[in-house]
Design a protein with these regions (language model features):
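A short, Lys/Arg-rich alpha-helix, primarily the initiator
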Residues: 2-41, 119-136
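Short, leucine-enriched amphipathic alpha-helices that occur as contiguous helical runs
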Residues: 16-20, 52, 103
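Short, charged amphipathic recognition helices of the HTH superfamily
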Residues: 29-45, 67-71, 102-106, 117
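Recognition helix of helix-turn-helix/homeodomain-like DNA-binding domains
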Residues: 48-66, 91-93
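Short, basic-rich loop-to-helix N-cap that marks the start of a DNA-contacting helix
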Residues: 62-77
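Glycine-rich phosphate/pyrophosphate-binding loops
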Residues: 80-86
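Short, charged recognition helix plus adjacent turn
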Residues: 86-114
Length: 137
């Protein structure tokens, strides 16, 4: 229990900022693991299809969005694994990816196969008659 508390203390302490702390923590961990290809926030915002200022406000919880796809795009840009994406969605107050939903299932398959290119994910969605994940979808 002590280990769990230490690892999750920031998310527990201030629930209004839990999403922010979680996203930054996961991105920082990935930057340590993949030091040869560092993730920059400006690139994550660009990949997600939003301006740097708007993306920063969403990530810092200064503005709220009801656009679940935007949060998923942030996670895909950050190369999050499925469990990390679902945690981020839950912390933001959105439903996690659900395998019985056809569109979510396509996204899950892409993530589980480590396809983090939005174009590839969009192609898979379109081939299945589903709405793109990209901002222009």
């Amino acid at each position: 229990m002590d280990k769990y508390y230490k690892e999750n203390r920031y998310y527990i302490a201030e629930t209004s900022k839990a999403f922010t702390y979680y996203m930054k923590d996961v991105i920082d961990k990935k930057n340590l693991a993949f030091c040869h290809s560092k993730l920059y926030y400006k690139d994550i915002y660009s990949f997600a299809g939003v301006s740097e200022s708007y993306g920063e406000k969403i990530l810092n919880m200064e503005k709220h969005t009801k656009n679940r796809d935007l949060i998923i795009r942030f996670c895909v840009a950050g190369r999050f694994q499925l469990n990390e994406i679902n945690t981020a969605l839950k912390l933001y107050g959105m439903k996690p990816l659900y395998a019985k939903d056809k569109r979510d299932a396509c996204i899950i398959v892409a993530i589980n196969n480590r396809k983090y290119d939005l174009g590839d994910i969009d192609d898979m969605l379109v081939k299945n008659g589903l709405v793109k994940l990209s901002a222009d979808g």
